[in-house]
């Protein structure tokens, strides 16, 4: 079970020293979380004491790292449409494909 990245952690990961794009970084982070949820086709549960129901999965450290990687990728390459390969490999183990 992992916690969502803080703004400070996002900025450290992306080596950002300024504050003027904080709102943009928060928006990217929320988008990254939503992307992961959609990519996995599962609801992400942050509370590890909650009982999971069908279609849910606990938010893991791998997902947290992918969230940081996505924010960094989208911040650095603002027109990028690809996800980092390492992120894709980490997330695929949790992905549920529609049938």
Identify the role of each PLM range.
Residues 1-99:
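Divalent metal-cofactor coordination and adjacent catalytic microenvironments
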